[in-house]
């Protein structure tokens, strides 16, 4: 296998990407194509499933051919994907019965509220690790069955298939032969029992979803089948599947209990490996399956922050304070601190661990001396404060003190932000040389399944440090900063409470 590579397919919310990795875990080739976001009504978000497939197949071929290679050079394919996004298709024709309903879509929020009012939240959380929310796949499937003419009848006859994006891609890559998913994607549907690792009959009955629609659930690293499409002339093993954040956790080599990664993107996604037992959160985090390799199942706690890098985009597009996102570090560095200014970027409410949908963005502590530099610094600081809130909840739930934070995503390139994050945490923030950890995780899962890499120790040894940020702020100053942030969050919540 000297001249072979692993192809990682990274199907995201706004684009489909493909990357070729060599045996040392280096990126050899990359291709990307954006696709259309469909907004039929306020709060609704859809994708065209055929466009998801065509863009993903297209970039897969492009990543290979632009290096002068062909399908015979690909040892295996690993897939990672936007999670929860729901596709239902006709088994006979292979055609979707409706657009993909995206994870951001809120059309089933009222139905979720009615389930909560029936007192079902504790039961659902105990089985799935998830709160009842329109974010997850279950109520999206139910909506399609209730609103697409003929869908429920076809589903009862076993003629419809449901899948998250990974299932849809495998179905198409195998010319409609394989209907599978992996445990990580299944664990985000709100239909999968994370303890028994099976589809939950009681939840299926509760939501009136026929079991015949659901894919077979497999490990995250095994040979599921082989490609049969015209994208590649040769048959390539499909050998790794994981949801995007799970793949990033694996790509960061957070393979032992207590290891944590934070992906700094438009929002932040923090995930902690909690070992071979699920931990039920008492602090509004999500319990999920991290991955499964062979019989070894690892679990995780996850917290999502809605607005992280998006606050920088707001300073650029909404306020005109900067012309490009990259300018924020230099602007913020003009001042040593925010001079008491706090920005709570609750533009879409507050995510974990607060879960306050009504909170709104607020700026506190502004004086006549406040400048655009103070505001820029407050925006960066807010990303670190929000991350600390989630990490504190993770420590409380798990009883594990975090040893270091592994960071990736676009905003992890901001050295000022990473230093402040380390200062607040009191432990090192470490940035790897390869920050494309999501695709790398999918590649590792696929490569391990076929013996391209011998074992976990071999891939672990490939993780390489780019830069380590060690805490340097005095503890008393950290305490003062945190007290101000907590006061600002309380004030943002109070502003949203119109009963006061």
UniProtKB/Swiss-Prot annotation:
Residues that, per the record, bind sn-glycerol 3-phosphate: 13, 83-84, 135, 244
Q: Which residues bind ADP?
A: 13, 17, 266, 309, 410, 414
* Residue sites binding glycerol per the record: 83-84, 135, 244-245
Q: What is its EC number?
A: 2.7.1.30
Alphabetically sorted, this entry's keywords are: ATP-binding, Glycerol metabolism, Kinase, Nucleotide-binding, Transferase
Q: Cellular component GO terms, alphabetically?
A: cytosol
Q: Which InterPro entries match?
A: ATPase_NBD, Carb_kinase_FGGY, Carb_kinase_FGGY_CS, FGGY_C, FGGY_N, Glycerol_kin
Regulation acting on activity, per entry: Inhibited by fructose 1,6-bisphosphate (FBP).
- Ranges in a coiled coil: none
Reactions catalysed, as given in the entry: glycerol + ATP = sn-glycerol 3-phosphate + ADP + H(+)
Q: What class of enzyme is it?
A: transferase
Could you tell me which pathway this protein works in?
Polyol metabolism; glycerol degradation via glycerol kinase pathway; sn-glycerol 3-phosphate from glycerol: step 1/1
Superkingdom to which the source organism belongs:
Bacteria
One GO biological process term: glycerol metabolic process
Q: Which residues take part in binding ATP?
A: 13-15, 266, 309, 313, 410
Example of a GO MF term: glycerol kinase activity
The text of the family note is:
Belongs to the FGGY kinase family.
What function does the entry list?
Answer: Key enzyme in the regulation of glycerol uptake and metabolism. Catalyzes the phosphorylation of glycerol to yield sn-glycerol 3-phosphate.
Recorded protein name is: Glycerol kinase
Q: Which organism is it from?
A: Burkholderia vietnamiensis (strain G4 / LMG 22486)
> What is the gene called?
glpK
